[in-house]
C-alpha cells in the first residue's frame, strides 16, 4: 500500500525579536462587478471614466465564444506546407471562425480593506489572452504579452488605502497570431493578494517528495522570504505544518533563519503511518 501524501501546507513566518506575529496574507478573487467593451480608447484607464454603458460580465470571461462566427474572423493568405501547398491561398485559419482577433477592455472598481501603509499588494492573473496592459488607478502597473502563462504584478505603489480602486485591463489578439483557437479575454481568475512587508512572495514555496515508501515519506520544502529594508533574515523563523485531507496536523517543523541561507528556509519533514 502506497502512503498517501496529499497534505495541506500551512506556514507561519515569525519575527524573533520584540512582538512575535504570524504572517498575515489576505487574498481576494475578483469575479463579479467587471465591465467589458470591444471598443478601444486611451481614456479607459482613467478612474473617473463612465463605463455604465459597457457590458457587465463575470470573470473568467471569453469574449469570442458568443460570436458572431464566420470565415472573415481569421481570413489568411498563406501556403500551408503541411498540406503540400506551394503558393499562398485564402484560408479561414484554423481557429473555428471565432471572433477572437481585436481589442477588449475590462474595468473593475474594488475595495481592498486589508491594504494599508507598510503592506504589499500583488495582482495575479491566471490567464489573460493576450498582450495584457494593466492599469491601477490610471497608472500602468505592467505589461505581459503571452496569453498562456499566469503572471503577477506588484501593485503596491498604485493602490490607495481606505477607498475605491480602479483596475483597467487592455487585451489584444493580433491577426495571424495563432494556428488554433487561443481564447480571448480574462479567461481565468484574477486575484489580489495583500501581505505584510515581510512575506512569502508569489511562487515562493517549493515542495518536493524525494522519498515515498509504504510506511513513511519525506517532504522537502524551500520557502523564500522577502525581508524588509533594515531587517535581517536571521531575525525570522518559520513554522510549518502538514495537514491531511481532514485538516489534522500530521507533522510540524520550525527553523530559524540564518545569514548563510540566502533568505530561504530549507526544511525536511517526515510523515509516517
What is the predicted function of each stretch?
Residues 209-217:
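Short, solvent-exposed loop/linker segments at the N-terminal edge
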Residues 26-30, 37-40, 96-209, 228, ...:
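Accessory beta-strand-rich segments of carbohydrate-active enzymes
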Residues 1-25:
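Bacterial Sec-dependent N-terminal signal peptides
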Residues 39, 59, 143, 252-254:
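Residue-level detector of high-confidence beta-strand sites
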